[in-house]
From Swiss-Prot:
Transmembrane segment boundaries: 15-34
Similarity comment: Belongs to the SMIM12 family.
Gene encoding the protein: Smim12
Keyword tags: Membrane, Transmembrane, Transmembrane helix
Name the UniProt record assigns to this protein: Small integral membrane protein 12
Organism, scientific name: Mus musculus
Length: 92
């Protein structure tokens, strides 16, 4: 009798296990929501690093006067002379 029972269980196992798993999953799902209670209010999303950086850059730009810029000639004086003036003729 036992070998026949095991053969039947082995043959029809997929048809038996899916409904059992479905019922166990549904009961567990509803039990979890019952224990957890009300859903919490969604937390306001925090700004990403890129958004915070853009906000900081915009705040920095608001305080500057963009009409006052350094001329390109003055910027060249700050470059290391050993590298950039190696192949240039000396200034007179």
């Amino acid at each position: 009798m036992w070998p026949v029972l095991w053969t039947v269980v082995r043959t029809y196992a997929p048809y038996v296990t899916f409904p059992v798993a479905f019922v166990v999953g549904a009961v567990g799902y509803h039990l979890e929501w019952f224990i957890r209670g009300k859903t919490p209010q969604p937390v306001e999303e925090e700004k990403s690093i890129l958004e915070r950086r853009e906000d900081r850059k915009l705040d920095e730009m608001l305080g500057k006067d963009h009409t006052q810029v350094v001329s390109l000639k003055d910027k060249l004086e700050f470059a290391p002379k050993a590298v950039l003036n190696r192949n240039r003729p000396e200034k007179n």
